[in-house]
Amino acid sequence: MITTYLIGIIISFGIISTLCSKFNYRSELSSQADYMYKTAMSIASEYGNAYSGGDVDDAPSLPFLKAVSRYTGCNIMLLATDGAVLMDTSDSGLDSVKGFDPAKYKKSNYIVNDFFGLYDSDYLTVYYPITYLYNTRGYVILSKSVKDVRSDADNSFNFNYIT
């Protein structure tokens, strides 16, 4: 009888832990996506007027964007509408994102995948258009490894277990 109760408790604990971990991960993913989206929106609105669709290496925003990238733990890229990389805070040397089509992901403000083959693993990616005189001139792209998001969710979940 006691063995049955112990087995039931262990199974219940396992099920609850698994479900809570998944819910916590989804919540963390959504929370970080919202934060990244707001950051991308801020970058696009703050520096959109200075952005002319050309070379942004001389733009005063480059050092600031690198600082934001380090602070948020996200890679920040400015892409032209055709996918040409205008600026990349990771200094990857990438010229363009092949097959870039922002219309492909209109259902959500974030995506979790390899972002048009750019990454070797899944990344949480948020993009926001840079507009100037009512025309889309490019896109602000923020990307963060899903492994980092999972780590943040696990740290939060572990903290909840301790308390």
Give residue ranges: language-model regions.
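Juxtamembrane segments flanking the first transmembrane helix
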Residues: 1-84, 90-93, 151
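Extracytoplasmic/periplasmic sensor domains and loops in membrane signaling proteins
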Residues: 59-62, 84-121
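Short coil/loop residues immediately preceding or within conserved phosphate-binding loops
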Residues: 73, 120-125
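Glycine-rich acetyl-CoA-binding "A-motif" of GNAT/NAT acetyltransferases
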Residues: 136
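Helix-start (N-cap) segments at beta->loop->alpha junctions
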Residues: 123, 131-133, 141-161
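Acidic surface patches and DE-rich sequence motifs
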Residues: 80, 117-118, 132
